[in-house]
């Protein structure tokens, strides 16, 4: 402990400690309430944003039946590049009438990942 007690930094006239950020007990409790209110306000904003995103996903996906057969997929569904859901019997693009061109996309990816490397020709003597 230090020799001389310090007063509250908010000027209320009560004594404070360094453990309570140089605030008296009343001011420190008020400070904690304000901090928790700020935290809850940011938490509520984040949850509202997350709820909006899930609501948008729900409207896009509907009843989780992303194909023409209207079968409910549940947790077994996968998202296709076109945005539809498909499962084991629809795992081929032709089965769920996917407009995405997988072959040309795969060829482009392979061309970028594996560039053609040619060395200089050596002249024979």
Swiss-Prot record:
PROSITE patterns: ZF_A20, ZF_AN1. Zn(2+) 1 binds at residues 8, 12, 24, 27. The keyword Zinc applies. A zinc finger (AN1-type) spans 61-106. SMART domains: ZnF_A20, ZnF_AN1. It comes from the Eukaryota. Keywords: Metal-binding, Zinc, Zinc-finger. Signal peptide: none annotated. A zinc finger (A20-type) spans 2-36. GO terms for molecular function: DNA binding; zinc ion binding. Zn(2+) 2 binds at residues 80, 82, 96, 98. May be involved in environmental stress response. This is Putative zinc finger A20 and AN1 domain-containing stress-associated protein 8. It comes from Arabidopsis thaliana (Mouse-ear cress).
